[in-house]
Amino acid sequence: MLWPALRSVLFQLDPERVHHLAHWALHRVPPALARARRPAPVPALAVRCMGLDFDGPMGLAAGFDKGDVALPGLFGLGFSHVEIGTITPRPQPGNDRPRLFRLPEHRALLNRMGFNNEGMEACARRLAALPAAARLGPVGINVGKNKATPNEDAASDYLACIERLHPYADYLVVNISSPNTPGLRQLQEREALDRLLRACVRHLAERAPGKPLLVKLAPDLSPEALDEAVDVAIAAGAAGIVATNTTLSRAGVERHPRAAEAGGLSGAPLERLATEVVRRCYARAAGRVPIVGVGGVMDAEGAYAKIRAGATLVQAYTGLIYGGPGFVGRVNAGLARLLERDGFSTLSDAVGADHRQGGGKAAG
């Protein structure tokens, strides 16, 4: 009950200032304390995916830790995996402030951060200095291109990040779907996507055979474009699909004073759209690669909806902002109850249940 009171105080402050305060605190959590305070894993929620073991489905989405590497503190919150990034080859400040806005009435955030980060060298140094005990689960690294790099040269940026960062990642994600870097989403088009992913997959395979490389897609693609992107990604050798990024849609928040701000919307208003994208990606992939469901996961029911729609793993960011330090523990406890309610002995049994006749009781 303490979190709602603390949140009301923090929400009086600038969102980026609060973000930096949170990182400051998380950085100071020693690995031993993180391990001791971490919520106990629920055996039924364990997942093996892409050759990696996850003690539950709930991970931290890219965007929260942009290379500051506060891994012990983040794993201490209960996340099964943490995705760092987006990281670019060269440091860049991102877009002008203000660039992060809360929409508390809608449990949402609106951001136009623009891949602000200190670059791949700083990220690599921090990860190299991290003790092995700080890694309490798989660590992903989400990579992107610098704003100044034209799309025709984008592959060089992604390859540079893969080259420098792959030794520190359990998996990598090619981010071509942020709405806050001009022209970036054009890389989701068939020919550009095929060229980029084939180059990235080949480069990683030569340096770390078997290490998974995924691609993160936007929720705003047409159904036909989404099907095409999934087909191209799988044909190019991607190990999975991350669905989805933030949306340009303002459905559900049209009347909010911040609705006219540029940027991507995340949180509860994105939940239904993102789940439908997961559903379509799962159907199109037809078991060839796993789907990581992201977007509007604010509670156990939202996470479960994505799992039943086809997500093997689920990630959250905005849900943590609104749900506080106990967020992951509550989601995992709720997922265990929902699995039991629907007669599933393991989480893996529930993945894609909505696509199967007799796949357990109806969600909700």
Curated annotation (Swiss-Prot):
The keyword Cell membrane applies. It holds the Pfam family DHO_dh. GO terms for cellular component: cytoplasm; plasma membrane. It is found in: Cell membrane. Its cofactor is FMN. The active site is at residue 178. One of its GO terms (molecular function) is dihydroorotate dehydrogenase (quinone) activity. It comes from the Bacteria. GO terms for biological process: 'de novo' pyrimidine nucleobase biosynthetic process; 'de novo' UMP biosynthetic process. PROSITE patterns: DHODEHASE_1, DHODEHASE_2. Its EC number is 1.3.5.2. SUPFAM superfamilies: FMN-linked oxidoreductases (SSF51395). Keywords: Cell membrane, Flavoprotein, FMN, Membrane, Oxidoreductase, Pyrimidine biosynthesis. It is a peripheral membrane protein. It is an enzyme of class 1 (oxidoreductase). It catalyses: (S)-dihydroorotate + a quinone = orotate + a quinol. The keyword Oxidoreductase applies. FMN binds at residues 62-66, 86, 142, 175, 216, 244, 267, 296, 317-318. Pathway: Pyrimidine metabolism; UMP biosynthesis via de novo pathway; orotate from (S)-dihydroorotate (quinone route): step 1/1. Substrate binds at residues 66, 111-115, 175, 180, 245-246. InterPro entries: Aldolase_TIM (IPR013785), DHO_dehydrogenase (IPR050074), Dihydroorotate_DH_2 (IPR005719), Dihydroorotate_DH_cat (IPR005720), Dihydroorotate_DH_CS (IPR001295). PANTHER family: DIHYDROOROTATE DEHYDROGENASE (QUINONE), MITOCHONDRIAL, DIHYDROOROTATE DEHYDROGENASE (QUINONE), MITOCHONDRIAL-RELATED. Catalyzes the conversion of dihydroorotate to orotate with quinone as electron acceptor. HAMAP family: DHO_dh_type2 (MF_00225). Belongs to the dihydroorotate dehydrogenase family. Type 2 subfamily. This is Dihydroorotate dehydrogenase (quinone). It comes from Anaeromyxobacter dehalogenans (strain 2CP-C). The gene is pyrD.
